[in-house]
């Protein structure tokens, strides 16, 4: 799988917070995917842990979130999806939360309002951001394997069309850092789920592959490739889908990974449209 143009940057008031951005997404849209660098948390959450659910010091997490928002160039409130590992999409409107961070029970958030910042927490699952240059709508989605086979990203495409009149061919989608096929080993029950979700897709070859180590009853799955297939099936142009190639599980120096460490921090992907 190729990448269309992810680039690491040093940005924001802290000056030392690396972000990953896609060249597909241009102003007035802003977005970014965090790494584990640039924060204040102590091990095993070192250093830019953005999730408060797994045991880190709350004040450290709050400082890390402020640093991320400054680096991306946005302000609160920050609306984040409290993932349910499905395909639930929720629309967010300006004023739904007065300040701070607002958690919504969903796997994806969409908005048509400028100045509304959407985000998702991950630690191996795919953080996806979607922008529509024609309507100005944006979305942030969490796509783990369950959300992938449930069709969370096609559900986002449909929701953007229903709520804002978005056309799939106008959308630009960026898939941030996530577990790669090198490390995502699964059993036959998960393989069957992917085979069902991708049935009839002519370009699904290479999504599921035998264990490279020859482990009986085990396969490896390429989550990003699976979501490319599903997005293309939903009408998104293949050259409007960007995907970071790095694996969160393999690259311990740069990324948190639940599969690798269990006790770990969380990364974020965030997106917004700046007011005119």
What kind of feature is each model-predicted range?
Residues 1-276:
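Active-site microenvironment for binding and transforming phosphate-containing groups
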